[in-house]
Amino acid sequence: MRHRCRVPQLGRPADQRKALLRALTTELIRHGQITTTLTRAKAVRSQADKMITLAKDGSLAARRQAMGYIYDKQLVHRLFDQAQERYSNRNGGYTRVVRTLRRRGDNAEMAIIELV
């Protein structure tokens, strides 16, 4: 039974699921928006919000924690430099998920997740 299961399983083992979410979060921060399935977009939304909250904190411990999650070191530095001015007046809700057309091959629900 799946009582109180908060993370979507995404049809993968735990290590592959964590690696997928790390990769999607890294690419979202790098490009500003990505197109993926709706379930993946909803799963990556919380991780991206956590990384931006760490960047707003700006402490050394928060920077090290973000470096342990985001794959690109220069991207972490860029995120920490921009987050203070970009998200200073916003308390959460740093991403937006917009539904798009279904994927042609398998009719999967697609969405664009973007940084606000």
Swiss-Prot record:
Entry keywords, A to Z: Ribonucleoprotein, Ribosomal protein
Disulfide-bond pairs as recorded: none
Pfam families in the cross-refs: Ribosomal_L17
GO-annotated biological processes: translation
Family: Belongs to the bacterial ribosomal protein bL17 family.
Residue intervals passing through the bilayer: none
Coiled-coil ranges per UniProt: none
Record-given protein name: Large ribosomal subunit protein bL17
Record GO terms (molecular function): structural constituent of ribosome
Summary of subunit composition and partner proteins: Part of the 50S ribosomal subunit. Contacts protein L32.
Gene: rplQ
Domain of life according to the entry: Bacteria
GO annotations of cellular component type: cytosolic large ribosomal subunit
Keyword Cytoplasm applies: no
Cross-referenced SUPFAM superfamilies: Prokaryotic ribosomal protein L17
